[in-house]
């Protein structure tokens, strides 16, 4: 018989930097999960993505065991990395803070494809381009 899920916890954690301190500790602790075990497994699985924020969806079962699914990093994080900027524009329509090429846009869309609600790469590129525009990052040829 399948184990009963008692909670689904969604967190966005820096890759390879999970530790029992807030926000991870309290979120998992209230469901009785072994926090150190989660941190070790998460850090091991995300060690190759250093510098990125990797969202994770943790399913906690009634026997206090857990499984987790790693999502793709947020488009905004990937865009900031590609453009080489610290943060997006405060006034995206007035102030441009950086630019990315179509090739970089396609690479980001390819990375985000599993988590986007898009049927093909063109639609995914449009979604990512919209995110870039809202951050004050121009897409150039």
Swiss-Prot record:
Keywords: Methylation, Ribonucleoprotein, Ribosomal protein, RNA-binding, rRNA-binding. One or more lysine residues are methylated. CDD domains: Ribosomal_L11. One of its GO terms (biological process) is translation. One of its GO terms (cellular component) is cytosolic large ribosomal subunit. The keyword Repeat does not apply. SUPFAM superfamilies: Ribosomal L11/L12e N-terminal domain (SSF54747), Ribosomal protein L11, C-terminal domain (SSF46906). Belongs to the universal ribosomal protein uL11 family. Part of the ribosomal stalk of the 50S ribosomal subunit. Interacts with L10 and the large rRNA to form the base of the stalk. L10 forms an elongated spine to which L12 dimers bind in a sequential fashion forming a multimeric L10(L12)X complex. HAMAP family: Ribosomal_uL11. This is Large ribosomal subunit protein uL11. It comes from Acaryochloris marina (strain MBIC 11017). The gene is rplK.
